[in-house]
Amino acid sequence: MEKYCELIRKRYAEIASGDLGYVPDALGCVLKVLNEMAADDTLSEAVREKAAYAAANLLVSDYVNE
């Protein structure tokens, strides 16, 4: 957990304690957020490219349900 930012560690603790809901389809959750980021014209092109690359890489390597 040390390599992740403070906000991620905070949300992790909230989920682990039951204060925040757990999403069983974690890969689907990640892909949904990355897709939203990649499509968001208000974000910088660099951030959108990072989100698109991460989502595409995840689809190729780990998310073979479709």
Curated annotation (Swiss-Prot):
High-level lineage: Bacteria, Pseudomonadati, Pseudomonadota, Gammaproteobacteria, Enterobacterales
Coiled-coil blocks: none
Source organism: Escherichia coli O6:H1 (strain CFT073 / ATCC 700928 / UPEC)
Assigned protein family: Belongs to the UPF0253 family.
Origin superkingdom: Bacteria
Protein name as annotated: UPF0253 protein YaeP
Cysteine-cysteine disulfides: none
One family name in Pfam for this protein: UPF0253
